Regions:
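Proteins with a high burden of low-complexity, intrinsically disordered sequence enriched in S/T/G/P/A and R
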Residues: 8-12, 53
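Low-complexity, intrinsically disordered/propeptide-like segments
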Residues: 4, 15-19, 59
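Hydrophobic membrane-insertion alpha-helices, especially the h-region
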Residues: 12-28
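N-terminal Lys/Arg-rich, disordered targeting/topogenic segments
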Residues: 1-9
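Catalytic glycan-binding domains that act on GlcNAc-containing polysaccharides
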Residues: 26-187
Length: 187
């Protein structure tokens, strides 16, 4: 009887770690499929130019379009980072992009360049990541009004986001940013 127990332990000692390793690798591969790093050269380039964390940019793209360059929202925002025509025109003027057309928002490099610049602009304008992300989602005018209202902000920082959609958006982007940071820690 003792002999059988001895044989089972070494087999279990080998199989159990292999099973755990297999499950961990399978989970990692699934997460990498769910949270890809597409357009990495472009993202890294514009992250460096704007000083933004590339994981934040990947998280915004994932949240906005799930990396679908042909995405169009019900509000007519277009491309990877979901930029609408009016915002696109504003950004193109600031970036001195001659001959900008609304259809250019479907070009990944153009959309990432514009979206990254705009997010950086909003974060600088409002002085924080939460406020910048909220403005990216709900618009700068709304964030200004929230900051001015003691129920939602202290004049500088948002303490409460009154739009559930925007509150969830900020939370989702932050969660995805953490996922990207963990999955691609070597990057």
């Amino acid at each position: 009887m003792k002999n059988r127990k001895r044989k089972k332990r070494p087999v279990l000692g080998i199989l159990l770690p292999l099973l755990i390793l297999t499950l961990a690798l399978t989970g990692y591969v699934l997460y990498v499929e769910l949270f890809p790093m597409r357009y990495s050269e472009t993202v890294e380039q514009y992250a460096a130019e704007t000083g933004l964390d590339s994981d934040l940019i990947y998280a915004v793209i994932h949240t906005e379009s799930k990396f679908r360059e042909d995405a169009v929202s019900p509000m007519d925002a277009k491309g990877l980072m979901q930029i609408n025509e009016i915002t696109g025109e504003f950004i193109s003027e600031k970036l001195e992009m001659a001959d900008f057309l609304d259809g250019d928002l479907f070009i990944p490099e153009t959309n990432i360049r514009m979206g990254t610049w705009y997010l950086s602009y909003l974060m600088e304008l409002f002085g924080g990541e939460t406020e910048g992300l909220a403005a990216y989602n709900a618009g700068p005018s709304r964030v200004r009004s929230w900051l001015a209202n003691p129920e939602y902000g202290d004049g500088t920082n948002l303490t409460n986001i009154p739009f559930k959609e925007t509150e969830n958006y900020v939370m989702r982007v932050r969660q995805r940013q953490k996922i990207y940071r963990v999955l691609y820690f070597w990057n």
